[in-house]
Amino acid sequence: MIDHVNSDLIRELRKRTSVSIIKCKQALIDSNGDIELAIDNMRKSGLQTDFIQSNRLTPSGLIAIKIEPNKQKGLMIEINCETDFVSRNSMFREFINTVMVTALNESINNINALKTRFEEQRLFLMNKIGENIKIRRFFVLIGNFLSSYIHRSRIGVLVSASGKINEDIIKHVAMHIAARNPKYVGVSNISEDIMIRERHIQMDIAKKFKKDPEILEKIVEGRMEKFMSEIVLEKQDFVMDINRTVGSILDEYCIKINNFVRFEIGDNN
């Protein structure tokens, strides 16, 4: 039996199995550096459950948010599991809270750094509850005033605002974002390329009506307004009062939304 293992072999075995470094090293020592034999031995001993679980889909999970007491820094995270049952598990929720607190306290801003920081705890939890668990994504938002909203732990919104702070209105805007899923705060946030592309598309559609250029231009303008009302927060009808836009509500209360982030379990963003 060998007493020293090449670090590259350990990394390769860990990559293929998701088992801890210590266990990978021991498995390679026991197999005299034969990685395939090490994997076989892991499977026989039950350690390979990590590998099996790590390849299973994780369609469920939770979105959670933590905002610092001064309301100027917050974090939203999505951690996935396989079933809704596990998403309600106290150990799973405690793991999420620990990840969030640590990320904020240690100013971790990179997803790979966060995954590395909690890999051992993740694997331990997987063995405890018997499901695959993945830290999918997180976002740190900094601003003058932060608010948030979570809908059934599956949709989360983190909002940064400034101006005359009205907590109720900002919370309602966060709820609106959860429901309507805008992509931008204002029209100025849309890139010129996107606007030009959409205008070309709408003009090509309008030309099929064979109208005068002036009428075609009005048709295109109307369609562009509709396009913006679908993706721009300030242009959308407010879910709390559909007779007004979000922008008009914000103007009335002298509030500015500087940025927002929206997560939904399983979306492609």
Swiss-Prot record:
Keyword presence, Protein biosynthesis: yes
Main localization (coarse): cytoplasm
Keyword Ion transport: no
Gene3D superfamilies according to UniProt: 1.10.286.20, DNA helicase RuvA subunit, C-terminal domain, Elongation factor Ts, dimerisation domain
Subcellular location: Cytoplasm
UniProt-annotated stretches for the region Involved in Mg(2+) ion dislocation from EF-Tu: 83-86
Key words of the record: Cytoplasm, Elongation factor, Protein biosynthesis
GO cellular component: cytoplasm
GO MF term set: translation elongation factor activity
Family annotation (InterPro entries): EF-Ts_dimer_sf, Transl_elong_EFTs/EF1B, Transl_elong_EFTs/EF1B_dimer, Transl_elong_Ts_CS, UBA-like_sf
Annotated NCBIfam families: tsf (TIGR00116)
Function: Associates with the EF-Tu.GDP complex and induces the exchange of GDP to GTP. It remains bound to the aminoacyl-tRNA.EF-Tu.GTP complex up to the GTP hydrolysis stage on the ribosome.
Family as reported in the entry's similarity comment: Belongs to the EF-Ts family.
PANTHER family in alphabetical order: ELONGATION FACTOR TS, ELONGATION FACTOR TS, MITOCHONDRIAL
Listed name of the protein: Elongation factor Ts
Native organism taxonomy: Bacteria, Pseudomonadati, Pseudomonadota, Gammaproteobacteria, Enterobacterales
